[in-house]
């Protein structure tokens, strides 16, 4: 099996530091890292919205963590990564183009939770991205898959919506703009 062992160069788009706008909880962030760091302290999320990834990470190290952070951080990362690829179809296609390669967030800064350093680590970011890639692949083939409507190019409303549509402020999924959850956040 092929392996992608660093999210740099050709594969920089896989990194949370990659500059790609993402809507999360009704707020537009410049990158996934800013959205993730903001989720640590929900009352201060807007402070992170315009920050670069390095600045967001620095600020995220100084905030008081929400009490349930250790139990919710993996689900939050999953939601934010899904939002990134559903809201940026060009990146979704690039993720699909990685084929069946194992995605490893290799690093030298010692992150053994989200990545792998010196051959050791849990690689949660890589695992999340591979799951999203599998869902994207399934959605292209299976009209019964819940993601088919969003990524496969068909929308039940018949409105002609395509990936890259209006992000729902409540759940970060995409809709044609008629989503009741989306409309309730305006």
Language-model segments: which ranges?
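Charged, low-complexity intrinsically disordered segments
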Residues: 1-186
């Amino acid at each position: 099996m092929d392996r992608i062992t660093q999210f740099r160069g050709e594969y920089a788009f896989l990194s949370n530091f990659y500059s790609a706008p993402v809507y999360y909880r009704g707020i537009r962030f410049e990158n996934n890292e800013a959205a993730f760091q903001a989720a640590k302290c929900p009352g201060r999320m807007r402070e992170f919205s315009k920050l670069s990834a390095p600045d967001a990470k620095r600020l995220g190290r100084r905030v008081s963590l929400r009490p349930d952070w250790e139990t919710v951080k993996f689900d939050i990362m999953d939601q934010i990564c899904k939002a990134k690829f559903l809201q940026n179809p060009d990146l979704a296609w690039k993720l699909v183009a990685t084929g069946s390669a194992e995605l490893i967030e290799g690093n030298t800064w010692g992150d053994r939770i989200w990545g792998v350093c010196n051959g050791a680590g849990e690689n949660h970011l890589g695992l999340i991205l591979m799951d999203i890639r599998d869902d994207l692949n399934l959605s292209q083939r299976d009209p019964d898959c819940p993601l088919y409507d969003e990524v496969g190019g068909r929308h039940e409303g018949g409105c002609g919506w395509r990936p890259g549509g209006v992000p729902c402020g409540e759940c970060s999924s995409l809709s044609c703009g008629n989503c009741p959850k989306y409309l309730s956040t305006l």
